[in-house]
Amino acid sequence: YYIAQLTELLTGYGEIFSVWLDGACGEGPNGKKQVYDWERYYACVRKYQPDACICVCGPDIRWCGNEAGDVRKSEWSVVPARTALAESVQERSQQSDDEEFRQRKITSDMEDLGSRIALEGEHDLIWYPAEVNTSIRPGWFYHPEEDDRVKTVDELTDLYYRSVGHNATLLLNFPVDRDGLIHPTDSANAVNFHQNVQKQLAHNLLAGLSPKASDERGRTFSAKAVTDGDY
């Protein structure tokens, strides 16, 4: 059933750029354990949408570890391959509709994933960049009583610098109301947030500067390579 539904989604709606396999527990109160055939799901996505990124419980984009929009100070993109195990993502994911979980922050004792110290002794590394998922409201769905709890322009701007600014992509949820519309407050705050970030980043502070380093490892790794545009 799941493969049939996934196939329908992947073949009937044009180009899909992202498939989000949530790690949140889908088991009910009957005590039965749900077993997921992850490799089969991945193969289905690759077959019908080969350019789509498979996120969270997938091999392409990793979850940052919380739903509060909080990331590690250094959110590395090259990490040990073991971090992509879908089962371990499930264990850390939300098990019920819990606002306390949604507000959980990154703590100092959470695993350092990609520093040189963390990678020492690791033999299997992968490119596995992080994605930050959070909502413009307290939760994922629309509730009229939360119309005055929408993230402000300043809060959204801070969220941007704490996610994108820390080397992660930002997935911002907009709960639609019962008419299928985004609330005017949510929309206005998002537009003003975008304009605020564009204004703050309009001037490239590095333009025209000549990078220097206290030490260099040969000409190939000279400081000027930072701005030479050769990737």
Task: Name each model feature, range by range.
Residues Y1-D230:
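Mature catalytic domains of secreted/periplasmic carbohydrate-active enzymes
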